[in-house]
Amino acid sequence: MRRIDPNKLELEERVVAVNRVAKVVKGGRRLRFSALVVVGDKNGHVGFGTGKAQEVPDAIRKAIEDAKKNLIEVPIVGTTIPHEVIGHFGAGKIILKPASEGTGVIAGGPARAVLELAGISDILSKSIGSNTPINMVRATVDGLKQLKRAEDVARLRGKTVEELLG
């Protein structure tokens, strides 16, 4: 899979979560901040990243840099996704279903950020299991990675799109 150049896209950033994390040392606790950020161009490209630093703005900056390195392309049909898919990560699972136009993005917090920034405006989703922001984002991205266009599936099977869709 080829890498997507973030400089050629107009990316929008959304901070999904900021956590205060502690490392316990002999003299007490060392506090740092961990940030989870989703970036996307609302036109079929989305990515997420994490960053950790002493201060919140630095953690967010690092997370944005990381997210730009992890961009994926999402096949979109009209305003929704081509087919139903289930994304997994750890104990988190998310079901993504295509929806008719005008439905809107029906998704909880972290998954909503990923889907909106990917440019999907009509979708149904249900998260099952772990609902921590990082697991939800990773499961959603996993689901989006599994999506295939009808043309790609037809080419893989050596058929035409008409034969495939019947």
Curated annotation (Swiss-Prot):
PROSITE patterns: RIBOSOMAL_S5 (PS00585), S5_DSRBD (PS50881). Keywords: Ribonucleoprotein, Ribosomal protein, RNA-binding, rRNA-binding. GO terms for molecular function: rRNA binding; structural constituent of ribosome. One of its GO terms (cellular component) is small ribosomal subunit. One of its GO terms (biological process) is translation. It comes from the Bacteria. It holds the Pfam family Ribosomal_S5. Residues 11-74 form the S5 DRBM domain. Belongs to the universal ribosomal protein uS5 family. With S4 and S12 plays an important role in translational accuracy. Located at the back of the 30S subunit body where it stabilizes the conformation of the head with respect to the body. HAMAP family: Ribosomal_uS5_B. The N-terminal domain interacts with the head of the 30S subunit; the C-terminal domain interacts with the body and contacts protein S4. The interaction surface between S4 and S5 is involved in control of translational fidelity. Part of the 30S ribosomal subunit. Contacts proteins S4 and S8. This is Small ribosomal subunit protein uS5. It comes from Geobacillus sp. (strain WCH70). The lineage of its organism: Bacteria, Bacillati, Bacillota, Bacilli, Bacillales. The gene is rpsE.
